[in-house]
């Protein structure tokens, strides 16, 4: 680690970060190996057969990298293998995996150095990186009640791999590293099509998650640059930090390219996009823009988002990916919830002296519900039920012990209730609970080669009822002796937890196998 920091200190004074020589250092691949083992979530290495890290193999890899035609032979060999034998990736399974992981770590160095060089970001509290996903919804409830229009944005995906390389050219001045990145991307792009297919993107995401996340986050960061820079224009002009100054230069370059294609567009026109009450939220490939401005202003924003980001990165957003709706008349899917801001009407009886009259009061309410159809579809994809929601057994779990089967089903049920605790209607959650409970009973009955009724009579339903205890009931038992805290009979109580740092697997269909 000391060698790694020493190299960075030497290169920091040159204002250019030559990260390519780090690929010839053995400790880089040790970092990559430690990252795979100590990751925050399970990482599946495809095709490596769980091979352990070997310093001898890494030394052989570094020696081969010094050969003149190493990269050309490797890529040509990998393209031939993909046409003949899909199980033989690159020229060696271990070399391809460990090299791509090491490259993913090396290419992140200029970005990490840029963050450390900003004095404003040195003393950021660590807890900000552990904010719960549920903390977003109280923010939406506090802000969206006073806004008028909502824009649903789907970030363009997939894109051509060459666009990703061009986006990194402004931040990585190391030309050999960019060429090596092209080698890796051409390796994952099977047919070298003009538009990257979902198959090659899925292959890259599955074989090298770190590299995929780095490229995707870089692309999203470039896309968000146009979304967030304009609302901060008035404040950025008063700042003198180097980071903000570089952003303004980058924005001016974009403006020059945009002015060539649209001669009638001037810099003064950009000030018409200013909106002091604008809020932006994004998760994965979806983004939400909420504003209090007029409908005409939102249409100008849509035109800006469609045309402006494509210069000079050639990243074009299709108009149908941006939907503009009135906030009180739209429902948006976000983080596994169907959210809306309906207007509820209340009749209030007032009395003035001897006269009685009714006042029609209209009030906005931020409503969040758990979607039934997508969740049942996720359970069906995970083979817990049919497409219509009828519970079925889980054959691949019949080799486990009874306690392991109960533990897995119980954990899934508790996670669903925990993640969707902010739903105002619990009917969908009770339906999912019924599906998982009956699927668990059928799995156990299939294991013991008996019917569900016979198995339940022998085991008893009390054990399952105690196993699937809801968290609301646990809270009511904890606070029963001290205060009145009961959820019995209440199906509209919403609870937002502060310990949820990742989306539930059943909510996110991309994580299901």
Curated annotation (Swiss-Prot):
Recorded GO terms, molecular function? RNA binding
Q: Which GO terms describe its cellular component?
A: chloroplast
Record's keyword annotation contains Chloroplast: yes
Q: Which UniProt keywords apply?
A: Chloroplast, mRNA processing, Plastid, RNA-binding, tRNA processing
- Pfam families (UniProt xref): Intron_maturas2, MatK_N
Kindly list the places in or outside the cell where this protein is found, as annotated in its UniProt entry: Plastid, Chloroplast
Q: Which InterPro entries does the UniProt record give? A: Domain_X, Maturase_MatK, Maturase_MatK_N
Q: What is its main location?
A: plastid
Q: Does the keyword section mention Chloroplast?
A: yes
- What processes does the entry annotate via GO biological process terms? mRNA processing; RNA splicing; tRNA processing
Biological role: Usually encoded in the trnK tRNA gene intron. Probably assists in splicing its own and other chloroplast group II introns.
Q: Which family does it belong to?
A: Belongs to the intron maturase 2 family. MatK subfamily.
Q: What is this protein called?
A: Maturase K
- UniProt source species: Eleusine indica (Goosegrass)
